[in-house]
């Protein structure tokens, strides 16, 4: 295994998880900023005597490459890696959306549009069979994972008409650069950002739910999708990590708390990393784990359906999900090296 972009938060979590993986060998990791320096220079919590290698060296040695790079870079590197016989798990947004949609929302010209048709969307709960043997995986982001898993049972039932989604994220979701996330600016502060339908994860959420509406429980990345619209407003919260999503779903038909819970428990029965709660989820219970905690709630007074979902943005929302995808790609037990229990307190 090799990691490009190992000096970002997602790269650090990949390092932590892959170093403990009993079935794979981490042969190298790169960072332009830390090349030639010891791992501990970037990550004092990790214990490893190796140095950050050159990107070219990692690409040459690794059989599977994780791209934990800024948007726009993976589309340049993935073709080279695939041509050399490597398999790729991309943590950026480069292969999650059709090229024309990507360009409209990310404002980056797509340099490898043909590869999008080969990429498999990396949400195992919905794409498990597709991921087995995949060469290129487009790993979803944290908000999208939480929102999709919160609403997927309603979409699969064919009753989802739309949703209003509010997301709350710890500051690590913004990456390692301190602009806008410095302690003095986020401490004792809560603020929305990219409101008014401008967040670039919106088309990914809509595409996911549209595929489920059209295809049902098990979906194909490039299969049929129905139109669905949702509103999404993210907020930055003064905590290090964690995502909490509250989705108010517009649904068809008559519902009760009992029927709603039964739908969710049936949909997620047997899923190793999704827990349907009786109470309300909280981010702290998921930290360090690859688990998503979900709670559907029928509001009898108004007849509304609310769904809450919590996860660790750096694990199930990023690196843990990437390792889950790796396990499926290689035919390994899906839960290998992935913690279900969180850290507490």
UniProtKB/Swiss-Prot annotation:
Its main location: cytoplasm. This is N-acetyl-gamma-glutamyl-phosphate reductase. Belongs to the NAGSA dehydrogenase family. Type 1 subfamily. It comes from the Bacteria. GO terms for molecular function: N-acetyl-gamma-glutamyl-phosphate reductase activity; NAD binding; NADP+ binding. Disulfide bonds: none annotated. Pathway: Amino-acid biosynthesis; L-arginine biosynthesis; N(2)-acetyl-L-ornithine from L-glutamate: step 3/4. Coiled coil: none annotated. HAMAP family: ArgC_type1. Transmembrane segments: none annotated. It is found in: Cytoplasm. The active site is at residue 142. PANTHER family: N-ACETYL-GAMMA-GLUTAMYL-PHOSPHATE REDUCTASE, CHLOROPLASTIC-RELATED, N-ACETYL-GAMMA-GLUTAMYL-PHOSPHATE REDUCTASE, CHLOROPLASTIC-RELATED-RELATED. GO terms for cellular component: cytoplasm. GO terms for biological process: L-arginine biosynthetic process. It catalyses: N-acetyl-L-glutamate 5-semialdehyde + phosphate + NADP(+) = N-acetyl-L-glutamyl 5-phosphate + NADPH + H(+). Its EC number is 1.2.1.38. InterPro entries: AGPR_AS, AGPR_type-1, NAD(P)-bd_dom_sf, NAGSA_dehydrogenase, Semialdehyde_DH_NAD-bd. It is an enzyme of class 1 (oxidoreductase). Keywords: Amino-acid biosynthesis, Arginine biosynthesis, Cytoplasm, NADP, Oxidoreductase. Catalyzes the NADPH-dependent reduction of N-acetyl-5-glutamyl phosphate to yield N-acetyl-L-glutamate 5-semialdehyde. SMART domains: Semialdhyde_dh. The gene is argC. It holds the Pfam family Semialdhyde_dh.
């Amino acid at each position: 295994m090799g990691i490009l972009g190992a000096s970002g938060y997602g790269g650090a979590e990949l390092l932590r998880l892959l170093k403990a993986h009993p079935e794979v060998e981490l042969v190298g990791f790169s960072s332009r900023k830390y090349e030639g320096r010891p791992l501990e220079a970037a990550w004092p919590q990790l214990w490893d005597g190796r140095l950050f290698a050159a990107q070219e060296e990692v690409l040459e040695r690794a059989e599977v490459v994780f791209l934990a790079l800024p948007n726009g870079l993976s589309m340049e590197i993935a073709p080279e890696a695939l041509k050399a016989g490597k398999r790729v798990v991309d943590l950026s947004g480069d292969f999650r959306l059709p090229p024309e949609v990507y360009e409209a929302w990310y404002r980056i010209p797509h340099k490898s549009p043909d590869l999008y048709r080969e990429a498999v969307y990396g949400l195992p709960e919905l794409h498990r069979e597709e991921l087995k043997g995949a060469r290129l995986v487009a790993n979803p982001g944290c908000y999208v994972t939480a929102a999709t898993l919160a609403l997927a049972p309603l979409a699969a039932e064919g009753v989802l008409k739309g949703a209003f989604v509010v997301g709350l994220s710890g500051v690590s979701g913004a990456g390692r650069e301190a602009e806008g996330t410095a302690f003095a600016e986020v401490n004792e502060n809560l603020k929305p950002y990219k409101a008014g339908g401008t967040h670039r994860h919106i088309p990914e959420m809509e595409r996911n739910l549209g595929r489920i509406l059209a295809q049902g429980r098990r979906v194909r990345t490039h299969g049929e999708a129905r139109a669905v619209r949702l509103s999404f407003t993210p907020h930055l919260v003064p905590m290090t990590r964690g995502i909490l999503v509250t989705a108010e779903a517009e649904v068809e038909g008559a519902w009760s708390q009992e029927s709603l819970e039964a739908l969710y428990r049936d949909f997620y029965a047997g899923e190793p990393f999704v827990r349907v709660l009786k109470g309300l989820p909280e981010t702290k219970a998921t930290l360090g784990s690859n688990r998503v905690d979900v709670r559907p709630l029928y509001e009898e007074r108004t007849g509304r359906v609310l769904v809450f979902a919590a996860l660790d943005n750096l694990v199930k929302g990023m690196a843990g999900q990437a390792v889950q995808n790796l396990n499926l790609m290689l035919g390994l037990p899906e839960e290998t090296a992935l913690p279900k229990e969180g850290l507490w307190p």
